[in-house]
Structure formats: structure tokens, C-alpha cells
Amino acid sequence: MRKKIEIFTDGSCFGNPGPGGYGAILRYKKYEKEHSAGFLLTTNNRMELMAAIIALEFLRDPCEAIVYIDSKYVHQGVIQWIYNWKKHNWKNSAKKIIKNLDLWQRLDVVSNLHVIHWRWVKSHTGHPENERCDELARIAAEHPKFEDIGYKR
């Protein structure tokens, strides 16, 4: 039987592109882990993707996860667009390689290890975990330490 995990994520970016960060909370029963990191030059969409990726990569065993995200870009991507992108060799309807390909492929790989229920939440509406992830992401963006190698490609 798979462990049931709750994951909350958010991304932030100043300038878009500019310094950015992500925040994530992983919850299993009464245990909770927070994680965040900041990047020198990135975009908001990349940080939203990174939050989900890193949170899922923390899971050591296959789990059943409910992932709460406030990014419509990520939510639409994982529940709708990714199937056609993969079918068309990661190209969009204009036959161009999709943006953030490196992260979408990474999310696809890690997502296939788990049973995931994606849930969109409206940002800045008092959802406590989303507000905390937003805070973690903003603080990380204010103190960036890492280079987003994929953004520079």
C-alpha cells in the first residue's frame, strides 16, 4: 500500500525573468517538511515547475500524492497539455519545442513514479499552506544562491 502524502507548492520571481525561488511543503500524517531554494535568473513558470519537481523527487518510495498548486500553467500542463506534447515529440500546436522542456520532461519522469492527484488552488485567498509556500518562495527569491542552468539554454 502506498503512503498518502500531501504536497503544497509555489514559485516566485522578481522581474520575470529575474531572481526567483520556490517553496514546498510535504506532509505525511503528522510529519511535515519544508523546502525552498532561490535562483539568480529564472522565470515564475520555471519556479512553479521546480517546486513540484523537487517535492516529488523528495519521495523515496512510490506514493499516492495530492499536489496542491496555484499555477494554472503547471496545472493545465500536467492534466491536459503534456499528453499531446509527448505525442508530438514535445512540440506545441505551432510545432515548436515547448518552453521549459527540461523541467517538463523531469516532471514527467518523476510523476510516473507515483499516483498523483493534481489540485489547483487560488493563490492569495488565505489557504494556509499555499500562503506559507508563497512566503518560502519569496524569501528564497530574495536570497538566490543557485543558477538555473536550463533557463540559459
Swiss-Prot record:
Residues 1-142 form the RNase H type-1 domain. One of its GO terms (cellular component) is cytoplasm. InterPro entries: RNase_H, RNaseH-like_sf, RNaseH_domain, RNaseH_sf, RNaseHI. Mg(2+) 1 binds at residues 10, 48, 70. Its EC number is 3.1.26.4. It is found in: Cytoplasm. GO terms for biological process: DNA replication, removal of RNA primer. Coiled coil: none annotated. Monomer. Belongs to the RNase H family. This is Ribonuclease H.
